[in-house]
Every structure is written in C-alpha cells, then in structure tokens.
From Swiss-Prot:
One of its GO terms (molecular function) is tRNA binding. HAMAP family: Pept_tRNA_hydro_bact (MF_00083). Hydrolyzes ribosome-free peptidyl-tRNAs (with 1 or more amino acids incorporated), which drop off the ribosome during protein synthesis, or as a result of ribosome stalling. TRNA binds at residues 17, 76, 78, 124. This is Peptidyl-tRNA hydrolase. GO terms for biological process: protein quality control for misfolded or incompletely synthesized proteins; rescue of stalled ribosome. PROSITE patterns: PEPT_TRNA_HYDROL_1 (PS01195), PEPT_TRNA_HYDROL_2 (PS01196). Keywords: Cytoplasm, Hydrolase, RNA-binding, tRNA-binding. The keyword 4Fe-4S does not apply. The record marks 12 as: Discriminates between blocked and unblocked aminoacyl-tRNA.
Amino acid sequence: MNISGLIIGLGNPGREYDRTRHNFGFMFIDALLEEAQRNPFARCEQLSGGKKKYDLWRCDIVEGQAPWLLAKPQTFMNLSGEAVLAIASFYRVKPAAMVVAHDELDLPLGRMRFKMGGGNAGHNGLKSITQCLGTPDFHRLRLGIGKPPAGGETTGWVLGRFSQSDTAMVDAVLEAAIQGIRTFATEGDVAATQYINAFRP
C-alpha cells in the first residue's frame, strides 16, 4: 500500500472522554476526517474500526499525493504505543514518517508547537510510543490545553471537558493544525514548524 505517512491522535476511548482536554489528539483526527469528507476530490476510507487496539482510516490530505493513514489508538492513553507499533509494523511505516498529535499542558489553549523528536514531558502516551518504537524520533504536534487554575489538580483538568467558552478557540486551533499538517506534507518540517509555531488565534 502506497502511503505518505501516519498521523496519530492520542486520547482515551469511550463517551466519558469525548471532548476532554486529554483527547485533543482524537479531536484533531476527527477534524481531519471531517475536512476530507467535505472535499469531493478526497478519498477517505476506514480500514479498521471496533478493533481492540486502534481505529484506522486512509485519507487524502493533499491532492495529488499518496494518502495518509489516520489513527486513533483504542488502548487507552498509557498503552498508545501498542497500537502505534501494530500499525507501523503492518503498514511498514517508519517513525520519521509519523506525526503524533497530543494535548500539551505547558502551552496555553490557542498555541501549538511542531517538532521532531524530544522528550515526553510527562505525557504517558508519548512515553508508551517511544518505548514501543524504540526511538523518540517521530514528529509531535503539541496542542496547548494550559495548566489548571491555581490549586487545581492536573488529572481532573486534563480529563475535564473544554468549556463552552473555549469552543471557538478549539475550532480555530484545529483548523490551523490541519493547515499545518498540509504544509508539512507539501513543504516539509521547516515550513510546518514555522507555520504551526507562529499561529495565534
């Protein structure tokens, strides 16, 4: 199968986690799928759903380019690497051709960062992927969620839902992130990093 790469959105499966901050990666994959389905020239098909480890689609992200695989691990966050390794092994995707979208406490809502490699910054999904792949050398799309208010507890914050007042900001970030991934697909790391890191809502 000819593919351009693999985009993974991190999150937890189940309705109780829908639109929580920790599921920002899932929301990004959903936004990519919705965008592809609105484009009459884009092909998008589900390759697996309801499997134990992952939901997977093959979609056109850029016209005239080989499709990308879009994945939502269904293993829960701390075991995300098991799903990523299973996909990478079956479809022969190298870590350098992967982008992992995830929530980022160290960035405020409305800000993003794109980078290749690096540490896990305490993110268990990234830690699992690094361990399973045996390398940290994959791209990360860090989607800011901000830190809890003073005295707030981190777990409750990341597992809490975005507020109604956050909706416009979240939508703007997702729209810009899609353009950022298209820039990565067509122009590479440097252009994507410049676009994504400079984004202001």
